[in-house]
Amino acid sequence: MGEGGYQQINKTLNACAFDDYLATQHARLPPLPDVEQISPRVVRVLGQNAGKFTLQGTNTYIVGTGSRRLIIDTAQGYRAWADLIESTLAQRSIRLSHVFLTHWHGDHTKGVPDLIRMDPDLAEGIYKNSPDHGQRPIEDGQVFRVEGATLRAVHAPGHSHDHMCFVLEEENALFTGDNVLGHGTSAVEDLGLYMTTLRKLQAQECAVGYPAHGAVIPNLPGKITNELAQKTRREKQCLVALDRIRNDQGRLASLTVSELIDVVHGTQLDEQVRKMALEPFMDEVLRKLAEDGHVAFRVRKGVKTWFALNTVRS
């Protein structure tokens, strides 16, 4: 799937997976320092782009213990972040050797020109899966080393087609990117692929997560288990709603995405939340359920409606 993929949900960054996530955006998030040494090998620098969908801002991570270190993600291109990075590197007598981009979204990639401005040699050290012109590729299982840190790349699509996570071997920690957040849950391009990725991340058996947004995840296995359970629960809610309408109105009864949202989430919804978040996500849930053989759709007079193929078992 290309960057046009399922799209508006990720292109605008005005997206979220479902109402659990929406509630988190409005909750009081714990403050995070602009710069913090979160482990002996990792310094976190906030992207200075806090917002409804970026939480406290994009986390960028300087990794290693020597004078040459690597950085994971580059935030959104705000001058305040560039100034923080420049001062942090200078104060610690650090020079960057590699720049790793977890995925293509602008709140992770737009700081690249600032890093190259600070050190033109970095133009040869920008790494990304499905790289843009002039960038170097990252492959699943590829290993990178700097003094004090060994990173192993893990291809982790679902939130985006090119998403990479990184295992920090010395700490049994995982840089989770946008696949697992410090608070709430992530938007996805492909729900089925995303759930497969979560199980792949589980198999890495990392204890701690360093997310691209939000606080450190101290119990990463528990967080991933909860993510899988939440998404499975959403699938079940959709199936139950479609099964109920079939039982009430007959075998051919079906619902549009908007009607299904009314049944599952109620009608008192903010219109932006409905259009930018719930409708794209509900459509993705239905796509996965169709791939799994549980639902199907028909199109009549240009209107797509969905119906259950099997009775839901409790």
UniProtKB/Swiss-Prot annotation:
Spans traversing the lipid bilayer: none
Binding site for Zn(2+) 2: 107-108
GO BP term (any one): secondary metabolite biosynthetic process
Cofactor binding summary note: Binds 2 Zn(2+) ions per subunit.
Pathway: Secondary metabolite biosynthesis
Cofactor: Zn(2+)
Listed SMART domains: Lactamase_B
InterPro entries: LACTB2-like_MBL-fold, Metallo-B-lactamas, RibonucZ/Hydroxyglut_hydro, Sec-metab_biosynth-thioest, WH-like_DNA-bd_sf
One MF term in the entry's GO annotations: metal ion binding
SUPFAM superfamilies hit by this protein: Metallo-hydrolase/oxidoreductase (SSF56281)
Active site (catalytic residues): 107
Keyword entries, A-Z: Hydrolase, Metal-binding, Zinc
Pfam family, one: Lactamase_B
Binding site for Zn(2+) 1: 103, 105
The reaction(s) this protein catalyses: atrochrysone carboxyl-[ACP] + H2O = atrochrysone carboxylate + holo-[ACP] + H(+)
Name of the top EC class for this enzyme: hydrolase
EC number: 3.1.2.-
Sequence similarity: Belongs to the metallo-beta-lactamase superfamily.
Task of the protein: Atrochrysone carboxyl ACP thioesterase; part of the gene cluster that mediates the biosynthesis of agnestins, dihydroxy-xanthone metabolites. The pathway begins with the assembly and cyclization of atrochrysone thioester by the non-reducing polyketide synthase Agnpks1. The atrochrysone carboxyl ACP thioesterase AgnL7 then breaks the thioester bond and releases the atrochrysone carboxylic acid as the first enzyme-free intermediate.
The protein, known as: Atrochrysone carboxyl ACP thioesterase AgnL7
Species: Paecilomyces divaricatus (Penicillium divaricatum)
